[in-house]
Amino acid sequence: MRRNDLKPFYLAGMLELCLLAAPAAHAQTSATRQLVEQGNYWHDQGRDDLAADTWKKLLGIDPDQPDALLGLAQIDLAQGRQSEARKRLQQLEGAHPQSPQAQRLRVAIGARGSSSAGEDSNLRNARRAASAGRYVEAARSYEAAFAGKPPPPNLALEYYQSLAGTPTGWERARDGLRRLQSSDPDNPSVQLALAQVLSYREPTRRDGIAQLRTLAQRADVGGPARSSWRQALLWLNAGMADAPLYQAFLAGTPNDAEVTAKLGQLRAQRTTATTPADPNGVLLGEGFRALSANNLSAAEQRFTQVLRARARDPEALGGLGSVRLRQQRFAEAQELLRPAAAGNGKWRNALESARYWQQLQQAETARARGDLAQARQLIEQAVQLLPNEPAGHVALGDLQAAGDPVAAEASYRKALARDADNAGALQGLVGLYSRQGRLQEASALFDRLPAAERAKSGGQALLRSNVQRARARQFLDAGDAVSAQTELEAAMVERPGDAWIRLDLARLYQQAGRPDQARSVMDGLLAVHGDQPEALHANALLAQESGDWQGAYDSLDRIPAAARTPAMTQLRATAWIELQARQARQLVAQGRVGEAQQLLARTDTALGNQLDDPQLLAALAGAHADAGNTQRALVLAQRLVTGASPRIEDRLQYASVLLRAHQDAELSAVLRQLQATTMTPEQLRRYQGLRSAYTLRQVDALRELGNLEGAYDALSPVLAQQPGNRDAQAALARLYAAAGEHRQALAIYQQILQRQPSDLDTLTAAANSAAAQSDLRDAERYLQRALAQAPESPDVLAAAGRVYRSAGKNRKAEQYFRAALAAQQRQAGQLDNGLASARGLAAVAASGRPLNPFSGMTGAMPRSPAMLSERMAAGSAYNDVATAPVAYIAPLAMQPGAARVATAAPVNAAADLSSDALPQPVRASTVPSTLPAPSRLRASTHGALPAVSGSDLQPRNIAAQALSARSSGNSVLDELRAVQAENSDGLAGGALYRARDGEDGLGRLDDIEMPVQAEFAVGEGKLGVTLTPTVVDAGTLGTDYATASRFGTGPQSAIGDALAANRGPIDTLVDSPVYQLLATEGDTAATRERLRRYALNTGLFNALLVENNNSTAAALAALANEPLPAYLLSINASNTPIGQLARDILGNAALSEQLGAGDAAALRALAGSTAAAQQTPTGLADTLNAMAASGNGSRRLSQDDTGVGVGVRYRNGGFSAELGSTPIGFQEQNLIGGVGYRGELGDTVSWSAEASRRAVTDSVLSFAGAQDARSGRQWGGVTSTGLSLSATADNGLLGGYANLAAHRLQGNNVADNDHRQVDLGFYVHALETEHQSLTAGVNLTTMQYDKNLSGFTYGHGGYFSPQDYVDLGFPVHWSGRTAGQTVNWKVDASVGVQHFSTEASPYFPTDPTLQQAAYDAASLAALLGLVDRYTDPVYASESRTGVSYNLSGAAEWQVAPQLFLGGRLTFNNARDYNQFSSNLYLRFVMDRLGAALGRAPQVLASPYAAEH
């Protein structure tokens, strides 16, 4: 039932309007009166259903019966049917407008509507204060509502009633009521109120009694008037003359014991007055009168005086025994009453009462120490002794309420059967019904308590606050936290000093994400009641629920040991254990595992027999689990569940240890078993906490494996059931962050911070999300809020370091990491947290030891592979649940004044949960991980982008996903080292050798480089300077024409050197018969002689001799007339172009027929040579002779160069820039460098962009340039200028990447070329252990060059430049390090298939003249026989498909703390060459802290290599 539903009845009770009745407008018949009483009875019993039936019967007799209309309207209001209640009021006002029933209903409806109809807040406060008995406050609020005016008629009555209760307002109240009576003399409400007020003071009490006696005879207000009449008689300081007043009351109520006793006292006074005085008798009389007046000290004094005179006087013994009874000194009472009863039987009942109450007292003591069985036995014995005494039944009901609400209700009902107004029974039922949701019945019973009994049991405020508190629990069960908060706040107003109400409210604030409000509620309690054990206990409970074990311990330590209950003692011991666990975790975090285990071992010893307590045993087992000693934790935890049927409590304890030990498989099974059990609400709360923590851990594990979808599926039931759960919302935010949705993640963190603005974990997480969006300003704002709260927190300081590191501010990150280490050291230096010395238990704590600055440098104790994230291993939300106490949410049944309200009824766990199944454990802690630890997975994406270069096209190196950096056992120290490794100054030097196969002087390459590198931290970045002496050598170019013609100026230069070396080809040509014919000079004797010799050789001349009868002269004459000789005699052939001669001769059959065998072919060869055809025979001979004369037959064309490269590089976070030159001293020198940026999109995606100008190092020509000594021409020194974009996605298990590149290649006297490249790859992390990592994948590379410039002639670049290239490779990366972590290595291997094709390309793409000369020279070379056949001076097209492979291995050894020796070997056949490379280097780190073996060998690479 809602608080507002009961408010009108509280108000009516305060006004006592429920007791008012005006004169009836009609006479009731006896049947009607019987039905009215029956309806009221059922209403008082909380059975509104039966009351409604009765009142409806009344309306069947009389449709306007006022009591029936009022009763049904009250039920309507209680059940929220306000409109129905108003209809009944209209009917009542129409039939009986002046009746008390109508007035009462108007007040009830008005009070109810006030909460929603804008009632004056002063009036509302006045009524609330009056109902709580705070009359001074109520009067002030009324007067504020009246604004200085007289009270209005509708409020005057309630105002004067409140005013009468104030110390100075009684007279004004009396006078005001008299004025009301004079203005409305027939109003029974005013008459009753005035009579009551008169009875409050002794001078007017008899007048009030007379008026109340008269009013008691009325049918309408008789009941309340009689109650007030009785109370006034008990208050009256009566004399013998007042006996008739008591006789008049007893005439109507003869069985009233107290009034009868009061009359007996008056009669005794009369007897005493007429009997001679007996001193002892007088003393006895005075003693009994004092006892009757509850003046126990006076009574004790009188009875003691009598016993001094008559030691065995039964009356004195009985009287003093009665005093001891009232003093609750029941054992002494028995000793006194036993002889009294023996002397006078009338004291037997008192003796039994003493025994009875002593047994109940002993039962309460047993219950307080937790011995419920003994308590039950004692209570049952007491009930058997006095079965009609209700207190025993109430005590039994209190004991049963926690586990058997049905039996408890029966016990309370038995008590009420013996005393219908018994406060304990009524209060017990109120609490029981409230917890069962029967709030209407609880409220009805609450209203039944008379004022005197309410005062006896603690007052109306206590009872009302208990109902409000129980109603708050009901609202919480229904998910209505707002109404629950309203009820608890109202309860706190009623009883501001009640520690348990404040604790309930503080818990509600805590759950609502308002820890500051929760703390304020408890601080308000401690400010007033800071020395009360209950207040300190409640404060300790809130502290432990918040994870503040230090605060819990300190609160409990302020309670004197003698005042601690068993629950307090147990909680204090548990808090101490948890503090030891925290210290152990700090030691483990610093890599001091041995010290942590020693600390807990001493804790075991110190606890001794206390480990028989399951709560302490579970706490200690959890501490071992936190320290990483899972085996010891499980051994201890097994003791909780030994036996055939472990208790639910012990199984919950066991589950909490499994949670802390990360034994998820077994934990899942235990939780499923518990789901089918019946638990108390407190046990169910803890079960739900364990279940949620387990589920959230699986969510995080799935997230860190990259299975975001599965993680959300596991999380969604928790979000649905607990939408306000901070840990569930934080898990959802982490899912968004993992998906790269940092904006959404930050929005969730902001929602959490609206409710919990001081939540450190959320503040640091929000800072990370803001930093991930490059919003450093917001990130810093969150960090400053966190640091303002916890400036010495190592976690917060480390989080700040991580944020600044991610933002590239390494210097600032280093400062925070150093501060975090210092904070850790301060904490570790106080291992006992100040708990040692005189406190016993904490004396076992080990003393702290300063942080070892050399920790981890030469190898730390091996640690188990991390199964879950650092957050899960260290605690946070999961361990908060696991370490939460299991018996310290103080059940209200243990709290004085609230015992009956708070009784917990058992609940079935399965009934309280949805049908959603628990997620399966993602991985068991006992199975070695074959996957990377989550922290490594996130780190692995950094630096994972494959390098892209126009000159380095080997398969993408997926090996960048390397092992995590060497661990020291302290994550903060590791991160500081990582930052220092980036910031530290360093020197490195080494030698690199690279060899490519190829032709000497052309494609062959031997490259030796000796880089010396120095790096210095500058601001937030790092500046590097490199000097690289370099030697390149391609060997000596061969002098044979076939080789020499493919270098420099090509065939033209090559043919001269070939002829100079050997003139035979010239002589052979010039001396050939056909060439001699062509060298004739017309009709000369020399010509005729050459013709004769030629004809003689061909046989023509012999034929002419025969024809001319062997006449030589005739034959010579005839020869001159032959076609060919006649043609040659007719022209000067030596000065005629060979081409023209060839056309004339070969084009005339008559002429060509006279050529000798083979001479026609020779002539055709001459004519086919472009160089020869255009020259005359004389000119060609001269040309050839000149070539031979100008050539150098012994020329050696060595291709080598030396120089020193210089370079400067700056890096700051993701930004990098470099500027340098190719080696100075090379023939061609170029400025090179680049600007790049590397960024991240979430935790799984990284990207980079670079604009660069790089040297192309494929050959001596492309790298250093070349000069053709034959022609003096220089060319080469190629650079590749362009843009590259890369992206990598890696979820820790699978990854993929894509690279795009576009470059223009340019060189001195080299044709420009454009290059485009695309790389795509996919890989899987196949193995990830503490010391090894194995990654395998597939890579596809495609690229194109516009031109084929792979040649070495003038205008070519000497670099591989296919027009199409495709490589499909299957790379594997294996990296690792030794167990001692002094040597690391990485091996990369790939095998695949490559295909490329090149188009034909002229020897001289930039110079047509040279190209033409090359054609001429090539034809002459063929003509002269320098080559087997003529070949065009063009590089032929090519298409090739084959196997590609790549094998690379690197290792690094830490030979000294700051000195590293490393090397690498590489073999590959990628592209169109085979290559081998090796290097050896030394690396020295200036900063000792930053000198740690990295996650992979830091190979000193060539500044000109693509990987640089």
Curated annotation (Swiss-Prot):
GO terms for biological process: cellulose biosynthetic process; UDP-alpha-D-glucose metabolic process. It comes from the Bacteria. The keyword Ligase does not apply. TPR repeats lie at residues 32-65, 119-152, 314-347, 354-389, 391-422, 423-456, 499-532, 692-725, 726-759, 761-793, 794-827. Residues 1-27 form the signal peptide. GO terms for cellular component: outer membrane. SMART domains: TPR (SM00028). SUPFAM superfamilies: TPR-like. Keywords: Cellulose biosynthesis, Repeat, Signal, TPR repeat. Required for maximal bacterial cellulose synthesis. Belongs to the AcsC/BcsC family. PANTHER family: CELL DIVISION CYCLE 16,23,27, CELL DIVISION CYCLE PROTEIN 27 HOMOLOG. This is Cellulose synthase operon protein C.
